Amino acid sequence: MQVIETLAQGLKRELKVVIPADEMEARMNERLVEVKDRVRINGFRPGKVPVAHLKKVYGKSIMADLVNEIVREKPTEILTSRGEKSATQPEIGMTEDEAEADKILKAEADFEFTVAYEIIPPIELKDASGIKVTREVVDVGEDEVNEQIERIAESARTYESKKGKAANGDRVTIDYLGKVDGEAFDGGKDEDAELVLGSNRFIPGFEEQLVGAKAGDEKTITVTFPADYPAANLAGKEATFDVTVKDVAAAAPIEINDELATKLGLESVDKLKEIVRGQIESQFGSITRQKVKRQLLDQLDELYQFDTPERLVDAEFENIWRQINTDLQQAGKTFADEDTTEEEARAEYRKLAQRRVRLGLVLSEIGEKAGVQVSDDEMQNSLFQQLRQFPGQEKEIIEYFRNTPGAAASLRAPLFEEKVVDHLLTEVSVTDKKVSKEELTAEDDADEKPAKKTASKKKAAAKADAAEGEEAAAPKRKAPAKKKASDESAE
């Protein structure tokens, strides 16, 4: 077998592989001898069929199998011998000339094929001790815990129907139909919708006009959708809602005590406080983790600069671009609404794709050199988390991960990445800084705002961490249900 390099440009490689006809014929004859005793042909005793006759009957079929085996196995062997790793599955090229292909199958011509691929660039690991990150820490105080418990108690509050007019704090049950320019619009209709007046769940002006209403009342409410409403076809538009009030209910008083804890399935209010404190600490810890990780990745991105395999970047860009267009479509917006153009957005997200690929390769190399491993138990736990997100679809999900090429790798990748980050945090300088809840969440809130042209680079950088999964929140279906897109993102 002869291997000739025909292209070495940047990360691109192309090889020409030639296996002489006599070598292919020798392999075929070996295979014929192997099957000789198992073949049954009329007129011949078992094991007595001449090889020449077997070749005449089965030669081309066996040669075709050999060709398939060679193109399936040899590229990996060749790359290993060259000390190279292909970024993606190599592309195999063979003759499309039927006459030439027939000669190969008859061992009358050399078998030639090409292997085209992009190599993963060699990465020389650098000293990470100069990297400095700040870990923001929030002390969870009693006030924070009590506020959260009050919100829990509020969500568990009961209401009792009352006669008379609705006031702020009362819950009204309504049917409504929204119209713009006299025409009903998608998402503008609901029945038996429950709304606590004063909760500011609906768009400005909606709830205020229901104060004083009684069960059985029919009202027409006029409101104006906010200019930044996520559904572009409604943003800034005046709308009317035909509302039927079906019930008015007064809120029952709530008390934070052992009785409340019992309703929630806990033995005491102290246990409730303990659980709530743990949940808050976990939430703050997740934000802190992402901010530390972002700092780490930003500095790694500055530390490592090298060409990235084009095919990996193309694939990553397509994933990003598909999500961006889905988000825009769901929000009823265009690139112009985001103060940019499709061309500018493509360029920006192309840079993001390059960054993701580069950081992915760096983290992979660091993890490999550090001996980072993802255990079977960790994979199993990750799969269970997936199953919990989709109750009733457990069988389909398990089948998907079992039968879909690359599915298990997609489950492993974020686990591996987080473990590499853990490893790096033992090597870099980490300084703890106590901050308030508002300081901790301020930057994250800013990242959730619509990506205007001036903010697009910042948002792109924030999204470069593949594990963060930051995506624009999809707008709710019911038109009056939220007053701002940013409110939706918070839910």
Curated annotation (Swiss-Prot):
Its EC number is 5.2.1.8. Residues 452-461 have a biased composition (Basic residues). It is found in: Cytoplasm. Keywords: Cell cycle, Cell division, Chaperone, Cytoplasm, Isomerase, Rotamase. InterPro entries: PPIase_dom_sf, PPIase_FKBP_dom, Trig_fac, Trigger_fac_C, Trigger_fac_C_sf, Trigger_fac_ribosome-bd_bac, Trigger_fac_ribosome-bd_sf, Trigger_fact/SurA_dom_sf. Residues 434-491 are annotated as: Disordered. This is Trigger factor. HAMAP family: Trigger_factor_Tig (MF_00303). Its main location: cytoplasm. One of its GO terms (molecular function) is peptidyl-prolyl cis-trans isomerase activity. Signal peptide: none annotated. Involved in protein export. Acts as a chaperone by maintaining the newly synthesized protein in an open conformation. Functions as a peptidyl-prolyl cis-trans isomerase. It catalyses: [protein]-peptidylproline (omega=180) = [protein]-peptidylproline (omega=0). GO terms for biological process: 'de novo' cotranslational protein folding; cell division; chaperone-mediated protein folding; protein transport; protein unfolding. It is an enzyme of class 5 (isomerase). Pfam families: FKBP_C, Trigger_C, Trigger_N. Residues 169-254 form the PPIase FKBP-type domain. Consists of 3 domains; the N-terminus binds the ribosome, the middle domain has PPIase activity, while the C-terminus has intrinsic chaperone activity on its own. PROSITE patterns: FKBP_PPIASE. Belongs to the FKBP-type PPIase family. Tig subfamily.
